[in-house]
Amino acid sequence: MRALDYRAAIETITSFLSEKLEESGSGGFVIGISGGIDSATAAYLAAKAVGTENVLGLIMPYYENNDVEDAKLVCESLGIDYEVINIKPIVESFVSQLGFQPDKRSLGNIMSRTRMILLYAHANQLNRLVLGTSNRSEFLTGYFTKWGDGASDYAPLINLYKTEVWEIAKLLGVPGRIIQKKPTAGLWEGQTDEDELGISYRLLDEILWRLVDLKMPKEKIVEELGISVEKVEYVEGLVRRSEHKRRLPVGPEF
């Protein structure tokens, strides 16, 4: 992986957030707190940038599990205000009007977009900006919901790979329990990122860095990492198929 100066990265991100908030004339940030490392790290960076009093966390569970307690731990350890909103009745009300029963993936996307609506409702009401929590690993592979968790005003982690977020979280003092837990999008019970992606984040990041940033030939990646070409092509496919998720809608030019 690249040799990133994590302390310098923290300063770059916090300066960016402070400047953008001032430019916008907004009163602070609203962040969805899931109980995972990405939202925790984004919240810690935001609080460092603009003060804890200017950061609101929204905890928006669908299932009753330990994620809510982890999310509360993040907010309380950091000292930011937070609200808990159970999205299950909202999602169920929406689904009841569809005329069909959505499959697991569609339901997960509905959950994610419901959270986005709640984040922006609070941000609009409070004259604040929504901070996204997606990292570069998710962004490049399309592992996010379009117009759901991929929607935000600013995304402080968007140029950090997942393995780099872990290192920055340690420096910021994110609780160890959060750093050590298995990454999950929380879209259904028992779901984990790495199971759904079909690859560990550590290997994924090594491949992505070489494939996307260095534009290294596949054969060289195989040689350096000691993996099969099929594994590299699998990641390459994730990047290619998710291109539409990384840009605004486009049409033909005339």
Swiss-Prot record:
Mg(2+) binds at D38, E138. The keyword Magnesium applies. The keyword RNA-binding does not apply. The gene is nadE. GO terms for molecular function: ATP binding; glutaminase activity; metal ion binding; NAD+ synthase (glutamine-hydrolyzing) activity; NAD+ synthase activity. Homodimer. The lineage of its organism: Archaea, Methanobacteriati, Methanobacteriota, Thermococci, Thermococcales. GO terms for cellular component: cytoplasm. Belongs to the NAD synthetase family. It comes from the Archaea. Catalyzes the ATP-dependent amidation of deamido-NAD to form NAD. Uses ammonia as a nitrogen source. Disulfide bonds: none annotated. This is NH(3)-dependent NAD(+) synthetase. One of its GO terms (biological process) is NAD biosynthetic process. It comes from Thermococcus kodakarensis (strain ATCC BAA-918 / JCM 12380 / KOD1). ATP binds at G32, I33, S34, G35, G36, I37, D38, S39, T133, K162, T184. Gene3D superfamilies: HUPs. Transmembrane segments: none annotated. InterPro entries: NAD/GMP_synthase (IPR022310), NAD_synthase (IPR003694), NH(3)-dep_NAD(+)_synth (IPR022926), Rossmann-like_a/b/a_fold (IPR014729).
